[in-house]
Amino acid sequence: MARLREFYKETVVPELVKQFGYKSVMEVPRIEKITLNMGVGEAIADKKVMEHAVSDLEKIAGQKPVVTVARKSIAGFKIRDNYPVGCKVTLRRDQMFEFLDRLITIALPRVRDFRGVSGKSFDGRGNYNMGVREQIIFPEIEYDKIDALRGLNITITTTAKTDEEAKALLSLFKFPFKG
């Protein structure tokens, strides 16, 4: 079992029950899934760029990403319908907890001038979004073998009803919020 899953059951759940006064442990918010999305606009000009992005995301997530395509043509961006424009991965269960563990303990501290992540990036429904500017903060990516620095978006979907509950949940997972 993943280290953070045990930590959630033994430490986070009792703390949240005490903090918010839930009547049942099933009411306690939990992390449902983590979605990693990498938009690759440069893939229009060069198809190799998409292959590199897919392989980078596969190394980071430990699972093969799905290539996302444009829903409609946009002449200004030189995009046609069904052109590949990015890739995404949805992590659940143990892989999700393993990724969260690596993100909190290894990847985020490797960000240059890191002072914590914003506490304002909640969507109003208990989900958290954050962007990573460079994929090289993850130890799985070898600096010598990358073709370009690419950022990615990380969405943490929780069952929390409010942003306050979601922030408390992530804070108990030792998520490094500013201030």
Curated annotation (Swiss-Prot):
The keyword tRNA-binding applies. Keywords: Ribonucleoprotein, Ribosomal protein, RNA-binding, rRNA-binding, tRNA-binding. InterPro entries: Ribosomal_uL5 (IPR002132), Ribosomal_uL5_bac-type (IPR020930), Ribosomal_uL5_C (IPR031309), Ribosomal_uL5_CS (IPR020929), Ribosomal_uL5_dom_sf (IPR022803), Ribosomal_uL5_N (IPR031310). GO terms for molecular function: rRNA binding; structural constituent of ribosome; tRNA binding. Transmembrane segments: none annotated. One of its GO terms (biological process) is translation. It comes from the Bacteria. It holds the Pfam family Ribosomal_L5_C. GO terms for cellular component: ribonucleoprotein complex; ribosome. Part of the 50S ribosomal subunit; part of the 5S rRNA/L5/L18/L25 subcomplex. Contacts the 5S rRNA and the P site tRNA. Forms a bridge to the 30S subunit in the 70S ribosome. This is one of the proteins that bind and probably mediate the attachment of the 5S RNA into the large ribosomal subunit, where it forms part of the central protuberance. In the 70S ribosome it contacts protein S13 of the 30S subunit (bridge B1b), connecting the 2 subunits; this bridge is implicated in subunit movement. Contacts the P site tRNA; the 5S rRNA and some of its associated proteins might help stabilize positioning of ribosome-bound tRNAs. Belongs to the universal ribosomal protein uL5 family. This is Large ribosomal subunit protein uL5. It comes from Neisseria meningitidis serogroup A / serotype 4A (strain DSM 15465 / Z2491).
